[in-house]
């Protein structure tokens, strides 16, 4: 029997300030807490079909090789993005065209409160992949 990858199931970020990062992803990006496992210092958050796990802990000495994390958003409204991130003191880069799972579409980049680079990507101009 063979298998194929359908999509990324979840991403895990190690964070120093777990409550602060939960607040950021809830208030700035609209994630909802789905499950909390206190014994693991883990909060699992959902936005649509995407799952983001935040776990309290220091970043590992080795690794740290993820460039950025991209969330597909709908609709893409730069002004709304800037407005939602401003209370967190986060500035958003210029809107650029980037290729992703659905093709080319508008994207902006910023860093979350712990320095992870985040891309918010809007819909592609066409439905072709």
List each language-model region with its residue ranges.
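Conserved short beta-strand elements that form part of the metal-binding/catalytic scaffold
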Residues: 32-65, 75, 117-122
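Short secondary-structure junctions
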Residues: 30-36, 91-96
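N-terminal beta-strand motif that seeds the catalytic metal site of vicinal oxygen chelate
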Residues: 1-19, 68-69, 73, 124-129
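Vicinal oxygen chelate
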Residues: 18, 69-117
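Amphipathic alpha-helical segments
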Residues: 19-32
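Short glycine-enriched loop/turn motifs at secondary-structure junctions
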Residues: 5-7, 62-66, 102
């Amino acid at each position: 029997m063979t298998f194929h990858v359908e999509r990324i199931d979840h991403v895990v970020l190690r964070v120093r300030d777990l409550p602060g990062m939960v607040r950021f992803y809830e208030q700035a990006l609209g994630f909802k807490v789905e499950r909390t496992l206190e014994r693991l210092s883990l909060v699992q958050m959902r936005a649509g079909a995407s799952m983001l796990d935040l776990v309290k802990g220091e970043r590992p000495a080795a690794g740290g090789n993820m460039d950025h994390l991209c969330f597909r958003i709908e609709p893409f409204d730069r002004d709304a993005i800037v407005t939602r991130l401003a209370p967190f003191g986060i500035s958003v880069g210029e809107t650029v065209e980037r290729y992703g799972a659905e093709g080319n579409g508008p994207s902006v980049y910023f860093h979350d409160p712990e320095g992870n680079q985040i891309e918010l990507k809007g819909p592609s101009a066409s439905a072709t992949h």
